[in-house]
Amino acid sequence: MLEPDFVKGNGLIPAIVQDCITGEVLMLAYMNRESWLKTRESGKATYWSRSRNSLWIKGETSGHYQIIKEILIDCDADAIVLKVQQTGAACHTGYRSCFYRKIVGESFEIIGEKLVDPEEVYK
């Protein structure tokens, strides 16, 4: 099976996640070889949580799964783009995308759509 070069990034590669229809950037996460293999095997995005130091199946707690539709790999084979069918919010804050804020001068402007209350989703 083809796979990214996990050596360059000390075992991790960045995974940029995009909506497969709109092209909207939903999030950035990291994958190790184990999460890569699980993702390829299951068809659901699985990442490596750097804070918890464990595998993380996107949507396992919230129900907001990311179904893989296409995978792109960069020229150095050390970063990927996952084109996904997003169910619900991609961001743990309840927004559709983790990139829901725009920098305007010295402040943030909310430009994204909040889909859920995280207090209700992550009980």
UniProtKB/Swiss-Prot annotation:
Keywords: Amino-acid biosynthesis, Cytoplasm, Histidine biosynthesis, Hydrolase, Magnesium, Metal-binding, Zinc
A Pfam short name: PRA-CH
Amino acids binding Mg(2+): 74, 76, 78
Record's GO cellular component terms: cytoplasm
Disulfide bond sites: none
Bound cofactor: record note: Binds 1 Mg(2+) ion per subunit. Binds 1 zinc ion per subunit.
Name used for this protein in its record: Phosphoribosyl-AMP cyclohydrolase
Gene behind the chain: hisI
